[in-house]
Regions:
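The AdoMet/dcAdoMet-binding core of the Class I SAM-like
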Residues: 2-8, 57-192, 198
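Short small-residue beta-strand/loop micro-motif enriched in glycine and branched aliphatics
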Residues: 48-50, 192
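N-terminal auxiliary segments of SAM/dcSAM-dependent transferases
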Residues: 1-48
Length: 198
């Protein structure tokens, strides 16, 4: 891949569009229990992560996604003390949540522990808050976790998932949203990633 002609391309199904980055090297590839995880060194976006062939983040611009999925929701709530992140295995959203001093508990419920471990290795700047005493990293099914939550036990829910395929498909089902609604307090806020705009 050092010849400058290598590209990683994500194609958007039958829509006739794609996005690609020139890459210098493949740094990591594995098939976890749930999905294929790849890390590349790109020419212009630093390291990039792909899951099942879809771009998840890059060193250069991940902050746009992580800040925007987090801060508007937390600033919209008058006192966001209890925050749940469903997904978010790269830990960037958790890091942004914990910038809010009023947050007392932040749960990150990620089904695939390998996403977090790979992120700790290749994107350590995103994982700096993993040891914060307010953070609880749980490697479990977020759908089942939400089903078990008592009523009025959360202030903010952030659904930081992949697109609605594979293990994330259930995160787009009405039953999951009923469970979220029950778990949120009266002024609760829910925000979610809702697929690529392309």
């Amino acid at each position: 891949m050092s010849n400058g002609d290598a590209w990683v391309i994500e194609r958007f199904g039958d829509e006739g569009s794609a996005i690609g980055l020139a890459v210098e090297a493949k740094l990591h590839e594995e098939q976890s229990e749930f999905q294929k995880i790849e890390i590349y060194q790109s020419r212009s976006y630093g390291k990039v992560m792909l899951i099942d062939g879809c771009f998840m983040l890059s060193e250069r611009d991940h902050f746009i996604y992580h800040e925007m999925i987090t801060h508007p929701a937390l600033f919209s709530h008058p006192a966001p003390r209890r925050v749940a992140i469903i997904g978010g295995g790269d830990c960037g959203t958790l890091t942004e949540v914990l910038k809010h001093r009023g947050v007392e508990q932040a749960w990150q419920i990620e089904i695939d522990e390998r996403v977090t471990r790979v992120s700790e290795q290749y994107f350590p700047e995103l994982c700096g808050s993993n040891g914060d005493p307010r953070a609880q990293l749980l490697f479990a099914d977020g759908i089942a976790w939400m089903r078990e939550r008592p009523a009025d036990s959360l202030d903010v829910i952030i659904i930081d998932s992949t697109d609605p395929v594979g293990p994330a498909a259930g995160l787009f089902h009405p039953d999951f949203y009923r469970d979220c609604h029950r778990a949120l307090g009266a002024q609760g806020v829910l925000v979610q990633q809702s697929e690529s705009p392309l």
